[in-house]
Amino acid sequence: MQITVREALRDAMQEEMIRDDKVFVMGEEVAEYQGAYKVTQGLLEQFGPKRVIDTPITEYGFAGLAVGAAFAGLRPIVEFMTFNFAMQAFDHIVNSAAKTHYMSGGQAKCPIVFRGPNGAASRVAAQHSQNYTACYSHVPGLKVVAPYSAEDHKGLMLTAIRDDNPVIFLENEILYGHSFDVPETIEPIPFGQAKILREGSSVTIVTFSIQVKLALDAANVLQNDNIDCEVIDLRTIKPLDTDTIIESVKKTNRLVIVEEGWFFAGVGASIASIVMKEAFDYLDAPIEIVSGKDVPLPFAVNLEKLALPSESDVIEAVKKVCYYSV
């Protein structure tokens, strides 16, 4: 059986709304229009306007409303049309949702999911293409999820909705329409468990979200040069499955990290720092990080392509750590 990422997310929200009447969805155009990307399709008809709520165009306003609802015991799912617009709600996410559990000594909970597309799409220019993975991962009190497959989107969304504290659920606009094979039943997937999608012995490639496809495609090409890549899909950035990464590096002795976001203070830099501390003696080459270029993402299609990680970038990085002529 195959379903799209869009359908996987919708199914997860639908199942949790049936299971728990405290769960509700809110955001711009999530009800009548059924979501800017049709992720909430059919939910208004099934659950009505009290649980599928169209909001004004004010991220600061409806994010604050949702955080208050979570403090009161409800379980809001907040859709941002894009995480670029969530900048308007940053204060509510970082200062209210993320910190209250700690500041209350564990007495107050904030069961809320902030979800929507993150990162580049296709020619939506600099202000609509930013990747916020590292930004939210930097904040104590936030769990950060960035899945690739339909099964993982659904399983991790089920877990996110049931979590008693805030989850940042980073989706990808391009992945919404991609279909994946899925089992008949998808159970909640625990946070902090990476997935080895391709076993190998020559080099470890660590990545997440849509860059997983880039890594898998590069690994297939590199196999022709007898370079056997192990590809790890992180699935969740925070908590990070450090153990799976370290064990893989101990086996392959080489590491390439692939992320769409910017290099400086990025996810890759944090992972590289951890591996250097925990597995330095196992490394046979410096760690390579493939990332987006340090520029606002251009609108021009040729420049946009050059600013984002490519399959050839991954291949070049892998050959470099394997001391292979390029």
From Swiss-Prot:
Stated EC number for the protein is 1.2.4.1
Name the Pfam families for this protein.
Transket_pyr, Transketolase_C
Q: Top-level EC class, please? A: oxidoreductase
Among CDD domains, the record links this protein to: TPP_PYR_E1-PDHc-beta_like
SMART domains from the xrefs? Answer: Transket_pyr
Per UniProt, the keywords (alphabetical) are:
Oxidoreductase, Pyruvate, Thiamine pyrophosphate
User: Which residues are involved in binding thiamine diphosphate?
Assistant: E59
Cofactors demanded by this protein: thiamine diphosphate
Instruction: Give GO MF terms, alphabetically.
Output: pyruvate dehydrogenase (acetyl-transferring) activity
List the disulfide bonds in this chain.
none
What reaction gets catalysed by this protein? Answer: N(6)-[(R)-lipoyl]-L-lysyl-[protein] + pyruvate + H(+) = N(6)-[(R)-S(8)-acetyldihydrolipoyl]-L-lysyl-[protein] + CO2
InterPro entries to which the protein is assigned, alphabetical:
THDP-binding, Transketo_C/PFOR_II, Transketolase-like_Pyr-bd, Transketolase_C
Q: What does this protein do?
A: The pyruvate dehydrogenase complex catalyzes the overall conversion of pyruvate to acetyl-CoA and CO(2). It contains multiple copies of three enzymatic components: pyruvate dehydrogenase (E1), dihydrolipoamide acetyltransferase (E2) and lipoamide dehydrogenase (E3).
Subunit comment: Heterodimer of an alpha and a beta chain.
PANTHER family (alphabetical):
PYRUVATE DEHYDROGENASE E1 COMPONENT BETA SUBUNIT (PTHR43257), PYRUVATE DEHYDROGENASE E1 COMPONENT SUBUNIT BETA (PTHR43257:SF2)
Q: What is this protein called?
A: Pyruvate dehydrogenase E1 component subunit beta
Q: What is the organism field in this record?
A: Rickettsia felis (strain ATCC VR-1525 / URRWXCal2) (Rickettsia azadi)
Gene that specifies this protein? pdhB
